[in-house]
Every structure is written in C-alpha cells, then in structure tokens.
Amino acid sequence: MFADETGYPALRFKRFSTAWEQHKLSKLTTKIGTGKSKYKLQDNGRYPILGSTSVIGYDNNFDYTGDFILTARVGANAGNLYRFSGSVKITDNTVFIKSKYNKFLYYYLQKYDLKKLSFGTGQPLVKASDLKNLKILKPRLDEEIYRISKLLLSVDNLITHHQHKIDNLKLLKRALLQKMFV
C-alpha cells in the first residue's frame, strides 16, 4: 500500500482513477535470475558483457537478448540499478530482471532502494530469490504504466542533457583558468 494505506498514489495523471494492484515482482516479470555467462574478452567482440555496474568488455557470442534491469549481486554496489537493451552476456555477479514493464519497474525499484535487501557485514549480497518476493504496486492499466515511464524517462533525459552541459562548462572554466592565470 501507499503511505496513506490506500491503493491510490498521491499524484496521478488525469483520467486515471483506479486503485493500483499489489503483486510479487516475480508475477510481473518473465525472468529474474543471476547471469551465468561464460565469456572470453575479445578485442573486437560484438556483444557486450554486462557486469555488476556496466559493460566490462565484449564477446563474439551472446546468451541473453532483450531489455534488462540489472543490479550488482554482491559488494558495495549491491542493489544499484542500471538498464540495458540488446543481445548480451551477463556475469555471475549480476542479477537481471526482464519484464514487459521494465521501464516502470526500473523507476519503481529505484524508489524501493534495493540496498535494503542486501545482507552481510563484509560483502553485501542481493539475491534473485529475494527480489522475486518483493511486493510491487502497479497501475491496472498499461496506458498509465506507459505514461509514468515516459514521464520519468523524459526527466532522466533532461538530467543527462544538463549534466553534459555542466561537464562542458567545467572544462571551459578549467581552460579559461589555465589561459588567464598563466
């Protein structure tokens, strides 16, 4: 349920008024698992090898194809999320999720903070089996899911765009400082 104990979010798009439904994450996905790819890093490999936080290299073969939500399974990055689409290999220290609701679930899980699931004092660990049992609230209508996902993706794109501008301005400032204060 939401913070106010109802099935209704505090902020909605117009025309949507039905309560959201609660499901286990496993019921909203086609696959939640740990990567099992064996790989050989290739200098000219065609397919990305996805590690716990990003692409770690390339191989000439792939084991998985589709849209994925990924998180580190073990270590300091356990619970950090990223998305990837395409044909890939996925390492064994990475948990992946495939769903027709990938974008929505990506944003929902960011709010959830998967780091709360990690356990262990030395090396935090997030298990696929724990993810499967997460309770997720989702709109009943796919159109509402699509609109929420589209809005949040637009905000992410704006953030990325402005971050590039900030990075370029920092480079410009550094160059100006070097030239002005020789």
Question: Model-derived features: where do they sit?
Answer:
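A short beta-sheet element
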Residues: 51-110, 119-123, 127-131
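Non-catalytic beta-sheet/beta-sandwich ligand-binding modules that flank or precede catalytic cores
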Residues: 20, 24-25, 37, 49-52, ...
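Short amphipathic alpha-helical segments embedded in low-complexity Lys/Glu-rich regions
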Residues: 45, 125-126, 170
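A short secondary-structure junction motif
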Residues: 4, 112-116
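Amphipathic alpha-helical coiled-coil/heptad-repeat segments
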Residues: 1-27, 137-182
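Conserved, well-structured core segments
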Residues: 48, 95, 150
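Non-catalytic DNA-recognition/assembly elements of restriction-modification systems
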Residues: 12-35, 40-49
